[in-house]
Structures are given as structure tokens and as C-alpha cells.
């Protein structure tokens, strides 16, 4: 397992919902990654929908797959 120093965190937008709690996420740099939900998000029943801004954790060994570790709050004024 990679230590926390080796992990890369990036923000992105969910563009597609796939079976088994998998999501296609477009990162800030334009790349798309396949991401699954972390255990804490699953345990707290946080819903991830299309268009949500999320923080994705990537390992330097495989930059095509990641883990959604945080769903950013939407601005409540809009």
C-alpha cells in the first residue's frame, strides 16, 4: 500500500456514473480517470451525483484509476 506521501490528490467533476459505485471523473487537467468511492463516504451514505465536484486520490503507479475521498459542497447561494 502506498504511503500518504506518495498519493496525488486532484479535484475533478463526475461526468459518468457506472455500475458498482464506480465513476468517470474528469480532472482539472483534462484527463479522465475511473474512480471508486472510499469506505468513509460509503459508510456515511454520501451520495455522489453527475456534476459533483470531488477530490480524487491517485497513486503514481496507475494514473488511470483513483478513489473519491471527498465531495465538495455546492455553493448554497446558487
Curated annotation (Swiss-Prot):
Domain S1-like: 1-73
Keyword Zinc attributed: no
Cystine pairings recorded for this chain: none
Keywords for the protein's UniProt record, in alphabetical order: Chloroplast, Initiation factor, Plastid, Protein biosynthesis, RNA-binding, rRNA-binding
Protein family per UniProt: Belongs to the IF-1 family.
Function noted in UniProt: One of the essential components for the initiation of protein synthesis. Stabilizes the binding of IF-2 and IF-3 on the 30S subunit to which N-formylmethionyl-tRNA(fMet) subsequently binds. Helps modulate mRNA selection, yielding the 30S pre-initiation complex (PIC). Upon addition of the 50S ribosomal subunit IF-1, IF-2 and IF-3 are released leaving the mature 70S translation initiation complex.
Protein name: Translation initiation factor IF-1, chloroplastic
Organism: Ostreococcus tauri
Chain's gene name: infA
